[in-house]
């Protein structure tokens, strides 16, 4: 049983963060924000996949001018990612953005910080302080001998102090590093010092497999420790894939569930069907289904139903014959490998209608 650390509650749009709220799934568009249509299309795709908050880069005024069109009717709250230029933060808030990712210590003098904080207060816009181990201040790097967890936390607290000095507490913090161990240590240290909500992730995690593994290890340990209020799985891949990995991490730890869990055997010499292809096609066909249930795809008619008896519905294939089962009990036999997928999907549709009471 995971006992989550209680943090301050804040809202990004209508999505509750921290407090008693669940861990929220977040991602970031990789489109050019100046292209409002493609950016909005990706936001819609992310939302359909289960993303609850989306961040967009705002590198210049042209991107800021596209925000109203992107924001209008968005299915999820949006966070504007701002670097250095306080005017972009002001423009983003005027456009109706739901939150900012900006480091107040990097935007210039006190008057500029005052302007951003004043506007954020007026519009109830939270600010995420985002510390990255790869871009720490040179003085901190010299003090700690590198991008250590202590250096990352001190950097975050310096930014926090600028906001608290102005009585601004609508704040979330992230401490990201490409090192799993440094990231874990940094978040644990931060949690000892402040109770602001934490946005957790492993930055520059890598391509699909490497990034999914690093993120799963790092985030899994943080969640087990009770840390983390929002999450992003950073992948060098389609951002929609980040959302799927995030939900699987949450499901694996019993924290949240969304959509079917698909279990399948790793194949062996007894496998007599194209199981890898079948399992992938079942997963593809169920993408977008939000109902929570377990589907098994097994490669052996002898052991399959018994090994997957906990599955709500499953299929096991043999040479020219497949069996469909529910909770380990055979309900149908299917002849011909080419019929396995279509007949199984029909049974899943029937199962879902029954589950939904239709």
Curated annotation (Swiss-Prot):
Gene Ontology MF, one: 4 iron, 4 sulfur cluster binding
Disulfide-bond pairs as recorded: none
Cited Pfam families: GcpE
Similarity comment text for this entry: Belongs to the IspG family.
Function in brief: Converts 2C-methyl-D-erythritol 2,4-cyclodiphosphate (ME-2,4cPP) into 1-hydroxy-2-methyl-2-(E)-butenyl 4-diphosphate.
Gene3D superfamilies: Dihydropteroate synthase-like, Sulfite Reductase Hemoprotein, domain 1
Superkingdom of this protein's organism: Bacteria
Name the UniProt record assigns to this protein: 4-hydroxy-3-methylbut-2-en-1-yl diphosphate synthase (flavodoxin)
EC number: 1.17.7.3
Gene Ontology BP annotations: isopentenyl diphosphate biosynthetic process, methylerythritol 4-phosphate pathway; terpenoid biosynthetic process
EC class name: oxidoreductase
Catalytic activity reported: (2E)-4-hydroxy-3-methylbut-2-enyl diphosphate + oxidized [flavodoxin] + H2O + 2 H(+) = 2-C-methyl-D-erythritol 2,4-cyclic diphosphate + reduced [flavodoxin]
Binding note for cofactor: Binds 1 [4Fe-4S] cluster.
Listed InterPro entries: Dihydropteroate_synth-like_sf, IspG_bac, IspG_bac-typ, NO2/SO3_Rdtase_4Fe4S_sf
Keywords, alphabetical: 4Fe-4S, Iron, Iron-sulfur, Isoprene biosynthesis, Metal-binding, Oxidoreductase
Pathway in which this enzyme or protein is active: Isoprenoid biosynthesis; isopentenyl diphosphate biosynthesis via DXP pathway; isopentenyl diphosphate from 1-deoxy-D-xylulose 5-phosphate: step 5/6
UniProt cofactor(s): [4Fe-4S] cluster
Binding site for [4Fe-4S] cluster: 265, 268, 300, 307
